[in-house]
């Protein structure tokens, strides 16, 4: 029903807000301010919950909403953290530019995803949309995994460059 769908979206967004706050807290407290570590966790977990959602279409509605909500919990963390991670790597000399570039990619991605989701759903059905979400999540996880050993910021590297000049 329309009411059930509206509540599902509302629960998804509420969990997304809570998850975004948690991602910031976990970045500082668990991952010692290494935002790329939390982004990797978020990408893996969001993809996992989307896989569960698609793999078990006959699950009870309450469980279905809970699985989607947990996907929402993890889905916005990277969006919130990527600007901070970029700014930290660029140091104070380029932090605003780095954050701006990351933000532009986020907004362009949001625009095309909204358009793309509708087109995919119309042409191939909603399962395809979720498969694409999982694939994009996997690509994001791979990208963040390649950064695992990166330092929390670029300040040490910047000091070395200045001393070498």
Where are the regions that the model predicts?
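Multi-pass alpha-helical transporter architecture, strongest
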Residues: 53-57, 126, 132-165
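A late C-terminal transmembrane helix in Major Facilitator Superfamily
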Residues: 92-123
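Hydrophobic core of transmembrane alpha-helices in multi-pass small-molecule transporters
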Residues: 61-77
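Paired intracellular helix-loop junctions of major facilitator superfamily
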Residues: 32, 86-95
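Cytoplasmic membrane-interface "Motif A"-like loop-to-helix N-cap segments
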Residues: 29-43
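C-terminal ends and interior cores of transmembrane alpha-helices
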Residues: 44-58
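A membrane-interface helix-boundary motif in multi-pass transporters
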Residues: 34-37, 119-136
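Helix-to-loop junctions at the C-terminal end of transmembrane segments
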Residues: 20-33, 121-122
């Amino acid at each position: 029903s329309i009411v059930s769908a509206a509540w599902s979206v509302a629960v998804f967004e509420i969990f997304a807000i809570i998850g975004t706050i948690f991602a910031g807290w976990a970045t500082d407290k668990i991952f010692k301010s290494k935002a790329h570590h939390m982004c990797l966790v978020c990408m893996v977990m969001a993809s996992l919950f989307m896989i569960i959602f698609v793999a078990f279409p006959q699950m009870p509605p309450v469980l279905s909403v809970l699985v989607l909500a947990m996907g929402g919990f993890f889905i916005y963390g990277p969006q919130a953290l990527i600007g901070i991670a970029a700014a930290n790597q660029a140091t104070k000399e380029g932090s605003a530019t780095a954050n701006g570039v990351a933000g532009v990619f986020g907004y362009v991605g949001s625009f095309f995803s909204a358009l793309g989701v509708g087109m995919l759903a119309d042409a191939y059905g909603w399962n395809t949309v979720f498969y694409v979400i999982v694939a994009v999540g996997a690509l994001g996880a791979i990208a963040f995994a390649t950064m695992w050993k990166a330092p929390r910021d670029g300040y040490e590297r910047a000091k070395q460059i200045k001393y070498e000049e």
